[in-house]
Amino acid sequence: MVQIYRTKQRQQQSVVQEVTITSLDLHGQGVGRSNGLVCFVPGALPGERVTARLTAKGKVASGRLQGRVETSSERIAPRCDYVGRCGGCQLQHLAAPRQLYYKEAALKDELSRAGIEVGAWQPPLTGPAFGYRRTMRLAIHQGQLGLRAVGSQNIIPINHCEVADPALARLLPSLQELLATLKGHRLLGHLELLHLPPHTAALWRLTGKLPKGDLEKLIAWAQSQDVALYTQQEAIAQHWPEAPVSLGYPLDGLALGVGPADFIQVNGAINTAMVAQAMAWLAPTKTERVLDAYSGLGNFSLPLCKRAKAVVAVEGVAAMTARNQANAKANGLDNLDAQTLNLDDPDAVQALLASGFDAALLDPARPGAQVLCQALAAGSGPGRVLYVSCNPATWKRDAALLIDGGYRLVQLGLMDMFSQTAHVELMALFIREG
């Protein structure tokens, strides 16, 4: 018999060492050096000497905080007792203004090393540090409902959440009680909560048809909590109240309609400030044709329509294109051309840009807008490009493309969309030279 020998994989060895933390990175991790290694330690702050269990890979080591030898004067007690277990908030041990300071410092360092120059840094957009989330997505598994644990798919059951809007946070204890009474646990995918005054909504994502008794319990819970109840297996169904509920939010003197499963920005206050700043920076006029790429349900499209001659809104999801069109019609705006288009398709993007634009607004998801930025850089392109990003890594890549193509980065600012977390959101304005 032939024997096949396989080389055993070497397990990575970890060792506890002392590390002096000098900065935070764009993931909110403490950064320091030890024995020639660059060390990343979640939960550590600049100025602290910590002990960490380090696992090295090349010249970099990832660490797990074991203790603090010296504690930063900036460290504060977290408001939430789930911190350290729940993966939702990474920075509650640091005051919100200092969170922004270190996020901006980390971004400046990244851009400096990439050779990207910023004309002017603008003050960050700020809002409430807690109680700001108007949407929540709760995981459900084996009868547990909550948020994912740090670095794991395990669920931490929660009865409160400091960053959730109080209208959503108040529902958590009753949801835990409700879940314990349901028989069809394995049919529950996850739960999405949404608060858009005056309405609160709950959408249960299902993998199969719920037992009749379970659905009756969901309806009874919704009635007792005054929550609009929806389920989705394939199509979305509203179960309570009987009359259709009109979900939406005001913005820039407009009313934007929203479906229970639609993507919206989680932070209403920052969203309002973000749109106002975008309009001020891009400054569209009644003689201009403007592109709104990754347009969603019209969060930027409709404010642009109020100011520009014409707006072409491009989105990859047909349902969002339809929502954008409906929102424009409901607000009496007739200068919107909403299209469904794959912005990762170079040919489609080339054809789109060939029609000509004076200005463009880009608001992509985390993968960024590489194909679109390549096309903008390669052609004559609009004179102004405003880029809203939720991922500095892909934004940095795309910014380099625009700069290489003749654009200048004239101003940049952070937006505190996700206070208490490591997430970094930014807005940047590029102007074509010459």
What are the roles of these predicted feature ranges?
Residues 1-82, 152, 165, 338:
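Terminal RNA-binding accessory module
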